[in-house]
Swiss-Prot record:
pH dependence (UniProt free text): Optimum pH is 7.0. Extremely stable over a wide range of pH levels.
PANTHER family in the record: DEOXYRIBOSE-PHOSPHATE ALDOLASE
Gene designation: deoC
Regulation (activators, inhibitors): Shows high stability to high concentrations of acetaldehyde.
Coiled coil: none
Quaternary assembly: Homodimer.
UniProt keywords, alphabetically: Cytoplasm, Lyase, Schiff base
Protein name: Deoxyribose-phosphate aldolase
Membrane-spanning residues: none
Species: Aciduliprofundum boonei (strain DSM 19572 / T469)
GO MF, one example: deoxyribose-phosphate aldolase activity
Cellular-component GO terms for this entry: cytoplasm
Location of the active site: D92 (proton donor/acceptor), K156 (schiff-base intermediate with acetaldehyde), K185 (proton donor/acceptor)
Catalytic activity, reaction form: 2-deoxy-D-ribose 5-phosphate = D-glyceraldehyde 3-phosphate + acetaldehyde
UniProt-listed NCBIfam families: deoC (TIGR00126)
Length: 222
């Protein structure tokens, strides 16, 4: 795999609370320079990213219910709609983790489905962050099944704000559950090309990283 091929797996990410307009401009310039698939930014910064990426084919992802997933479904829906209206192509929503731990699977599925049904007609894709660090393997399996049943396009390992990030074994498990019908995004703690390629070999079709430039620049060290 060469640098351009690897870059096309990557959502170049800045979800810091203190990210400035200048930080987002830099993120977008790096995305253009390295050929990353997308940038991932907080909803407030989607308009900025859309401005900086105008005329390119680089996608814009934004987050919903981030990073806890514990807000109202209606809030997630409106947040997603507004992000797409402002230029987002993809929505990375956080599953309601507490409801998942409660075993309230009907609610978890509805929470996802309502976001999916709101933005799919607008042409946007939905990734569901299941936050693997808080789940047992059985819960990870169930979460993936619910995301698939709800019509989501991807399952995603982590917010990057939890107690741990992506693990190869979790990516393998998630891929085994969703099959080839959905994407799997590995995110959190991926800092170099070796880690990124391990995730891809495990079944990830997208990598979320804030240190994407390091990932590309360490490719030659493998």
């Amino acid at each position: 795999m060469d640098a351009r091929e690897l870059a096309k797996y990557i959502d170049h990410t800045n979800l810091k609370a203190f990210a400035t307009r200048e930080d987002i401009k830099r993120l977008c310039e790096e995305a253009k320079e390295y050929g990353f698939y997308a940038v991932c930014v907080n909803p407030y910064r989607v308009k900025d990213a859309a401005e900086f990426l105008k005329g390119t084919d680089i996608k814009i992802a934004s987050v919903v219910g981030f990073p806890l997933g514990a807000t109202f479904t209606e809030t997630k829906v409106q947040e997603a709609i507004m992000a797409v209206r402002n230029g987002a192509d993809e929505i990375d929503m956080v599953m309601n983790i507490g409801a998942m731990k409660d075993g309230d699977y009907g609610f978890v599925e509805r929470d996802i489905r309502e976001v999916v049904e709101a933005v799919h007609p607008m042409g946007a894709k939905v990734k569901v962050i299941i936050e693997t660090c808080y789940l047992s393997d059985e819960e990870k399996i169930k979460a993936c099944e619910l995301a698939k049943k709800a019509g989501a396009d991807f399952v995603k390992t982590s917010t990057g704000f939890g107690t741990a990030g992506a693990k190869v074994e979790d990516v393998k498990l998630m891929r085994s559950v969703v099959g080839n019908d959905m994407g799997v995004k590995a995110a959190g703690g991926i800092h170099n090309a070796k880690q990124a390629i391990a995730m891809i070999e495990a079944g990830a079709t997208r990598i979320g990283a804030s240190r994407s430039v390091e990932i590309i620049e360490t490719l030659e060290l493998i």
